[in-house]
A protein has these predicted regions:
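Substrate-binding pocket helix/loop in short-chain dehydrogenase/reductase
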Residues: 97-99, 103-109, 204, 208
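Catalytic loop of short-chain dehydrogenase/reductase
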Residues: 138-162, 167-176, 188-189
Length: 253
């Protein structure tokens, strides 16, 4: 499958794993549309890719804002006449609150960041994915979606379990259009977020690392490698699956 003239959208792509995914897909030959909410950084990252002869642009919008998602993904789809790959990378912990003290606003914020965003972007992209070449959606869940998260991260785990479920539901719903839908589940990856945990809560970080069977943190490029595979023709018979990328961490938690 040639990736010439193929279009990939990567949400939350201005740093960390998202940027490495956008870079790898660009190296694979995709035109990549980077999304984020920090416009100056987004423009800078798109320029970095362009300097490496990657066809890239930045489109800023908040993935938790339904109207913004609809209008911007529609604009991207109309500009390129299709979408081939949607990577729902945007998401995050959002903070920590135990259920007894949890505010409704916090609950809604975390669910919106992880689950609503996946739904909004996927729904908006479907009409253009139908026009794509071997189209696919790639979502992001987490070990927390399997083990319900650590202290204060229960609603994060709940939201990521929802992403796991919506991945399968979308795969079932879109199979008739040959749109594949899968998810990746990164473990503890060497990103600024985990570097912050290491410096502020070293005991928590140590417990995470001790549960990684391969004895080291994953690298963002290793997640990007799997996303690249799922976006390729080599994965043409894979749908409704979640791939763990955690060095065996899911077995240790």
């Amino acid at each position: 499958m040639s990736t010439e003239n193929k279009i990939a959208i990567v949400t939350g792509a201005t740093s960390g794993i998202g940027f490495e995914v956008a870079k790898r897909l660009g190296q694979d030959g995709f035109t990549v549309v980077l999304n984020g909410i920090e416009d100056a950084e987004g423009a800078k990252k798109a320029a970095e890719l362009q300097a490496e002869d990657i066809s890239a642009e930045y489109v800023g919008f908040d993935v938790t804002n339904e109207d913004a998602v609809n209008s911007n993904i529609q604009a991207i789809g109309e500009k390129y006449s299709k979408i081939d790959v949607l990577v729902n990378n945007a998401g995050g912990l959002g903070g920590r609150q135990r259920f007894e003290e949890m505010t409704t606003d916090f609950y809604r914020k975390v669910m919106a960041l992880n689950l609503d965003s996946t739904f909004f972007a996927s729904r908006a992209a479907i009409p253009y994915l139908k026009k794509g070449d071997h189209p696919t959606i790639i979502n992001y869940t987490s070990n927390a979606g399997w083990n319900a998260g650590g202290p204060g991260a229960g609603i994060y785990g709940t939201s990521k379990a929802g992403v796991h479920a919506i991945t399968r539901a979308l795969a079932k719903d879109l199979a008739e259009y040959n749109i594949r839908v899968n998810a990746v589940s990164p473990g503890t990856i060497d990103t600024p977020f985990h570097a912050q945990i290491k410096s502020t809560k070293p005991e928590v970080f140590a417990s995470w690392k001790n549960n990684i069977m391969l004895g080291r943190l994953g690298q963002p490029q290793e997640v990007a490698n799997v996303v690249s595979f799922l976006a390729s023709a080599d994965a043409s018979f894979i749908t409704a699956e979640t791939i763990q990328i955690g060095g065996g961490q899911a077995l240790g938690i």
